[in-house]
Amino acid sequence: MGKGDVLEAAPTTTAYHSLMDEYGYEVGKAIGHGSYGSVYEAFYTKQKVMVAVKIISKKKASDDYLNKFLPREIQVMKVLRHKYLINFYRAIESTSRVYIILELAQGGDVLEWIQRYGACSEPLAGKWFSQLTLGIAYLHSKSIVHRDLKLENLLLDKWENVKISDFGFAKMVPSNQPVGCSPSYRQVNCFSHLSQTYCGSFAYACPEILRGLPYNPFLSDTWSMGVILYTLVVAHLPFDDTNLKKLLRETQKEVTFPANHTISQECKNLILQMLRQATKRATILDIIKDSWVLKFQPEQPTHEIRLLEAMCQLHNTTKQHQSLQITT
């Protein structure tokens, strides 16, 4: 695996439970499974706390994942500290596996909640969505995009607060400005950045991704947030993702709401602002200032708002003189 400074080297062993024991982690039951490995509960004996251990098999994982996406995921998570993001503690590498030690969210995920209980009340949807908004505002203010927002990546702690997880497609958006520029001036260039790595699930993907076009990753995040909010209050996805051509057609139209759900007009308006074409789509700054979100917001993220406002102001001033950057 590349970027060796990201990981701690671990002794070679065939049994990952034995290796985890050496580091003080007593591995328990599996709580999640993915393409390249599984997530387990574990007890960290040195601090007497429960954690989550994501164990990735190098044999199952692709070279692209091991050499590009996994190091990027760890690098991103190492710089993040926010109450609505899953905390990263450490990463350990052996000859056959990579172990990522994370904060444990003991309440399952929001998708499981919806499948069990159905649509959220609007106050509960407002609570969870405003927490999601605060977490994404924090990311975007640091020029970081998630690119895989979906209900199953919104975990719940024991108090049923949202914890955004799975940063496998997250990235720090590059800037073409010299290091000597002010941080805010360098950051603003992210708004002129387009991605061409087509990440995430079709059901949550913006129309630009579905059409295979370079896309603004900040606006792809806010589209996914629109899908999430719709599903919270309706209990099903806004678009049929079983057929790609049908999905693409549906995402070009204004989303409709079922008559048998009581949803406030404020909530509907916000969803419509997020589920629209990129040139008119709400940014995270628009969302965080929205009247419906403000009713449920536990606190005003004044630092993030100031950063985002400065970035938007600079972007609007300089965008005519900037060329688009396209990366993966």
From Swiss-Prot:
Gene3D superfamilies: Transferase(Phosphotransferase) domain 1. Its EC number is 2.7.11.1. Activated by autophosphorylation on Thr-197. ODF2 potentiates the autophosphorylation activity of TSSK4 at Thr-197. Ubiquitinated; HSP90 activity negatively regulates ubiquitination and degradation. Its cofactor is Mg(2+). The gene is TSSK4. GO terms for cellular component: acrosomal vesicle; sperm flagellum. ATP binds at residues 31-39, 54. It is an enzyme of class 2 (transferase). Expressed only in the testis. One of its GO terms (biological process) is fertilization. This is Testis-specific serine/threonine-protein kinase 4. Keywords: ATP-binding, Cell projection, Cilium, Cytoplasmic vesicle, Developmental protein, Differentiation, Flagellum, Kinase, Magnesium, Metal-binding, Nucleotide-binding, Phosphoprotein, Serine/threonine-protein kinase, Spermatogenesis, Transferase, Ubl conjugation. Serine/threonine kinase which is involved in male germ cell development and in mature sperm function. May be involved in the Cre/Creb signaling pathway. Phosphorylates CREB1 on 'Ser-133' in vitro and can stimulate Cre/Creb pathway in cells. Phosphorylates CREM on 'Ser-116' in vitro. Phosphorylates ODF2 on 'Ser-95'. Activated by phosphorylation on Thr-197. The modification Phosphothreonine is found at residue 197.
